[in-house]
Amino acid sequence: MLMSADSSDSAKTSVICSTVSASMLAPPAPEQPSTTAPPILGVTGRSHLENALKLPPNTSVSAYYQHNSKLGMGQNYNPEFRSLVAPVTDLDTVPPTGVTMASSSNSPNSSVKLPHSGVIFVSKSSAVSTTDGPTAVLQQQQPQQQMPQHFESLPHHHPQQEHQPQQQQQQHHLQHHPHPHVMYPHGYQQANLHHSGGIAVVPADSRPQTPEYIKSYPVMDTTVASSVKGEPELNIEFDGTTVLCRVCGDKASGFHYGVHSCEGCKGFFRRSIQQKIQYRPCTKNQQCSILRINRNRCQYCRLKKCIAVGMSRDAVRFGRVPKREKARILAAMQQSTQNRGQQRALATELDDQPRLLAAVLRAHLETCEFTKEKVSAMRQRARDCPSYSMPTLLACPLNPAPELQSEQEFSQRFAHVIRGVIDFAGMIPGFQLLTQDDKFTLLKAGLFDALFVRLICMFDSSINSIICLNGQVMRRDAIQNGANARFLVDSTFNFAERMNSMNLTDAEIGLFCAIVLITPDRPGLRNLELIEKMYSRLKGCLQYIVAQNRPDQPEFLAKLLETMPDLRTLSTLHTEKLVVFRTEHKELLRQQMWSMEDGNNSDGQQNKSPSGSWADAMDVEAAKSPLGSVSSTESADLDYGSPSSSQPQGVSLPSPPQQQPSALASSAPLLAATLSGGCPLRNRANSGSSGDSGAAEMDIVGSHAHLTQNGLTITPIVRHQQQQQQQQQIGILNNAHSRNLNGGHAMCQQQQQHPQLHHHLTAGAARYRKLDSPTDSGIESGNEKNECKAVSSGGSSSCSSPRSSVDDALDCSDAAANHNQVVQHPQLSVVSVSPVRSPQPSTSSHLKRQIVEDMPVLKRVLQAPPLYDTNSLMDEAYKPHKKFRALRHREFETAEADASSSTSGSNSLSAGSPRQSPVPNSVATPPPSAASAAAGNPAQSQLHMHLTRSSPKASMASSHSVLAKSLMAEPRMTPEQMKRSDIIQNYLKRENSTAASSTTNGVGNRSPSSSSTPPPSAVQNQQRWGSSSVITTTCQQRQQSVSPHSNGSSSSSSSSSSSSSSSSSTSSNCSSSSASSCQYFQSPHSTSNGTSAPASSSSGSNSATPLLELQVDIADSAQPLNLSKKSPTPPPSKLHALVAAANAVQRYPTLSADVTVTASNGGPPSAAASPAPSSSPPASVGSPNPGLSAAVHKVMLEA
């Protein structure tokens, strides 16, 4: 036997040429028990183990191991016997007539090891040789011929003693094993061997890698012999049930990592994967033979072979592998075997066209309720006695939805139809063999297509209507054709008419539905081969049926298949509308839930905190919600379509009560967007038809200035018509703020309600929000031309934050307190001062409205007013970011201090006409005298110029706000300077604290408060207002603690708890310094004069202490003023006063929050303003009137 030292490539095949001469049958040696020498049997393989692995299951291989290293011919070995082996890479290269052999005299002693698979010869007795099984006995060769030069003869001189025991054992086995001992590799037929010419061609490595191979491992019942290279005996005893390691051929210990392997290879593979070992590349062309005796020589090739035989990297775990792993893998293999059986059965079923056709037709008739017979009776009944359905909204083209139908009812009504399509898909031959992912992909993509094909017969074009599932008839003109839904309705009816004109049979409809579902071009499919095969077979069945039913229409099938793209387009449009509706429907449900909660808690809000006086606490929540923001290009022009803005300025005209909208949107069913408008939730204010369709039914209250300038829509509100009279009086307000960059006053003041707080949520009207959702289908139907596009102003900002929304609400409450003075006391006039938001001079509302309505969008953008304040625009843009909030707080303080130091007494404004409604009115335009005084003061702030200017000259400072602030600001203090200043102030306070008194009795008494020398501007103000006597009570100066990182707004709320209880013009005891302590927030960027040097010097009872006079209207003087957030507030009639005072405390952290309410009958009517110290900005500055019957309370805040 010749064993090759080098292993050849597995793709090569080995050709075994053996010659048996007549002299081979000579008697053997005397010591042999047998009298005849058996012929030679050839088996290919690299080694004993590899040959053993190639044997089929349940095959005895005892005879295979009889010759381990040499042929047992002994001295009787015929020298003329030649056994030649040559590598062949292609079966076609094997000569069909055999290979000639060289004479033994040419090279009788030459022995060359060929680099190919080794050859093992096994002798077999001719007496037991049979022909009914496949054999590999090589034919006897003819007289020797010339051989090619590359063939060499085998050595034929071998010792005899080594083989006597083996031959005896072989003969013993030959007597008990009559079956052939040499089998072909698994999976190969006998025809693969070419016996002609004595040449047998066997692939060297031809095992199919299938799970069945696991069962084909050889069962060893003898001892494995060593090879010719002197390898020691393996001495592996097999008990008849043991398999070999797939990697090295050793005894397998179990099923490890997906294959049978020994403990050594199992541990080697686990260590290699877990430790991620990178072995050195093999130096022998990566083709090392991995055996038990040399498996540790080349670790690179060993790991490579582990992976090649099927060891799984994913199966490697840390810790003990459970026993269920083997069971799972075996179950998967069995399942794979079953799947292959099912695939073979499926192939048979798909190839049988009549059987496939019968299966699909049976599935269609069992799962479809809309066959020809059923639909024909339904259509006839609908034509004879129609029962028309007129739904306000349509949930589905074939399912009329009553107004109060819920989503659950709709789903339950339509679920069985969808279930029928799913069951039909499951009954299509081959569908159950697909993976779950492929099933889901096909059903998700083709469910609507197949459903629409089934329901296409429900469209009756003769009466231009739809027969619904419940038998009712719905006319086409009854369907709401709003927005882009008109295109979908028209396309649906056209497609239905086109399909119905083909007059398809049930078999054709069923096969067409199957083709629509089983389509191989869906994205995400994995088993494309099976799906394509199913599609082609189903298409062939449809072609057969069409040819059978319509022999005169050869192009009918192509015409039918051309409808599939249109069907997919309709499905896409339907899906888009469904997605849009789901998003908006969820938002509507959320808003309705908010409305219910707010309606239940509206009274509690009046008694809990001053925030109840805001227009609606939910408006703040809406502002905080990211869905509340609408881009400026999508915001509707709600201002110009509302009747409130069409009234003359200052004229109150009552409008007749109009009908409220029905519960159309509140009870919107699931698929409202399918055939109805783009969305019932969007109140698109069409300017062209708002008088008869939009605003005639509902009053949409919203600020155009807020929509266009700020770019932020805080939930347009639908209110009762009883509030239209209140809203008609604020037409001047919309235009007074139309160029306000922030727009907070306009939006919030319009949302301010009457004192009873019967706002729109408690009244039951629905609130809608325009969403940032994509357009429904992208196909415009032409009815959008009347929509008012938003004026795209340069000051728009699509950013907002919860804090800015709260600031807007606080500004609203300031304006509310001011308006109550004007309403109840027309002789008074108030200027509303906001540290950040500043109103602009008003323009003609009619002229601007006509300009905007008559101009295209592009002209509106080009003719937009210029930016008045670029710095405010940047501040608005950076507002949502947290890292700019600290800087914004400092700028607020700067603006507050500047406003307080520059407010003059000539800011008296004249109100318009007397208002009878408690809705707050807008800020009136200041007279030219006040504007001139404001422009002439060089120390005035940007905020004050925004308030008082009426000429273009006054806007120079606001146009250069940064320069103006820089010129007005004093040098900034470094942190060290601030610390030294605070230490000095603390020392001064300690010296003056001994003379302080914390009790007050009576109206005119004052407790001494510590104060430092004010800066020059403050001194000037003190000299100016020193003669003005005020009645106030101040508590002891609180301790100041420098906390640059504290938030002034949040920390100042704790200082607003100074209790004030007075029944009749009496002051209450003020809080102690500990009760009213507040962290003092001083900014290094502060530019005001007051914040740099806080007041620290003591003042007498009659000294001119810098005071701020805040006028607040309280109807009942007997009701005390309570600024505590935790204690209940007074009734709503006094709510505006509380909010105004609370705002002053919350917004100005540098103020002392010691508040006292006293009764006063006013002062001279010609007084312009109250004292305004430099360190505290006024929230509302005005003058009392002695002719008033109601008491006007003065809330005094100490600076």
Curated annotation (Swiss-Prot):
Comp. bias intervals (Low complexity): 139-149, 162-172, 641-653, 792-804, 831-845, 897-942, 950-961, 1041-1077, 1086-1104, 1159-1187
Bias-annotated ranges (Polar residues): 993-1006, 1018-1040
UniProt main location, coarse: nucleus
DNA-binding region location: 242-318
Protein name (record): Ecdysone-induced protein 75B, isoforms C/D
Induction of synthesis: The expression of this protein is developmentally regulated and is correlated with the 20-OH-ecdysone induced activity of puff 75B.
Domain NR LBD, residue spans: 352-600
Protein source organism: Drosophila melanogaster (Fruit fly)
GO biological process: cell differentiation; ecdysis, chitin-based cuticle; hormone-mediated signaling pathway; intracellular receptor signaling pathway; molting cycle, chitin-based cuticle; negative regulation of transcription by RNA polymerase II; oogenesis; positive regulation of transcription by RNA polymerase II
Gene3D superfamilies linked: Erythroid Transcription Factor GATA-1, subunit A, Retinoid X Receptor
GO MF assignments: DNA binding; heme binding; nuclear receptor activity; RNA polymerase II cis-regulatory region sequence-specific DNA binding; zinc ion binding
Family named by the database record: Belongs to the nuclear hormone receptor family. NR1 subfamily.
SMART domains to which the protein is assigned, alphabetical: HOLI (SM00430), ZnF_C4 (SM00399)
